[in-house]
C-alpha cells in the first residue's frame, strides 16, 4: 500500500504543482466495495479516504455502488475524500477514453482532490501503449479540475509502464 501511494505521489509531482494538502506522515485508507457503504477507517488519526468509483476490467465498465456513500461518509467525518478508478486499459486508447468519459462526470469528491488511476492489472505487453493510456487519463483528470495520481505497485510498473 505504501509503495502504491509513494509511486503515485512521485508521478503526480511531474504533472502539476500539488494543490492537495498533505503533510508528511498523513495516513488514510483505500476503500472499495469490501469496506461497506460507509467505509471503515483503520485509526482515529486517519486523515483521508480514497474510494473506488469503479473502473474498467475484462467485463467492461463497472461501478462500485458504495462509492457515493463512502465519499459522503468520509466528508461527514471531516476527512479528506479522494477517488480512484480501476484502470485496466490493455494499452488501448479507446478503453482509456471510454473510461474517462464515463467516470469523470460522476466523481463526487471536491475539485482539486486526488483522482488516481489504479493500474495494477490489465496491461498490454506494449509498454509504450500502457504508458500513453496512463498519461492520457492523467491529462483528462487534470483538465477536469482534479489532481491526477498513478496508483500501482513497483514490480508491475517496472514490467508494464
Q: Where are the regions that the model predicts?
A:
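Generic alpha-helix signal with a bias toward terminal, lower-confidence helices
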Residues: 17, 41, 93, 156-158
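Generic domain-boundary/flexible-linker signal
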Residues: 60, 159-161
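Substrate-binding cleft of extracellular glycoside hydrolase catalytic domains
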Residues: 23-146
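Short amphipathic alpha-helical surface micro-motifs
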Residues: 12-15, 98-99, 152
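Sec-dependent N-terminal signal peptides of Gram-positive bacterial secreted proteins and lipoproteins
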Residues: 2-22
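Aromatic-lined carbohydrate-recognition surfaces of secreted/lumenal glycan-active proteins
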Residues: 144-159
Amino acid at each position: 500500500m505504501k509503495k502504491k501511494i509513494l509511486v503515485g505521489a512521485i508521478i503526480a509531482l511531474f504533472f502539476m504543482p500539488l494543490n492537495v494538502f498533505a503533510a508528511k506522515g498523513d495516513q488514510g485508507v483505500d476503500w472499495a466495495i469490501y469496506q461497506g457503504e460507509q467505509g471503515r477507517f483503520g485509526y482515529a488519526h486517519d486523515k483521508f479516504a480514497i474510494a473506488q468509483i469503479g473502473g474498467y476490467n475484462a467485463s467492461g465498465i463497472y461501478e462500485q455502488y458504495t462509492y457515493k456513500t463512502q465519499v459522503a461518509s468520509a466528508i461527514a467525518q471531516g476527512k479528506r475524500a479522494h477517488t480512484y478508478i480501476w484502470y485496466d486499459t490493455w494499452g488501448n486508447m479507446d478503453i482509456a477514453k471510454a473510461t474517462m468519459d464515463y467516470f469523470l462526470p460522476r466523481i463526487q469528491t471536491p475539485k482539486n482532490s486526488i483522482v488516481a488511476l489504479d493500474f495494477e492489472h490489465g496491461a498490454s505487453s506494449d509498454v509504450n501503449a500502457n504508458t500513453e493510456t496512463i498519461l492520457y487519463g492523467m491529462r483528462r483528470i487534470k483538465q477536469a479540475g482534479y489532481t491526477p495520481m498513478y496508483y500501482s505497485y513497483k514490480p508491475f510498473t517496472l514490467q508494464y509502464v
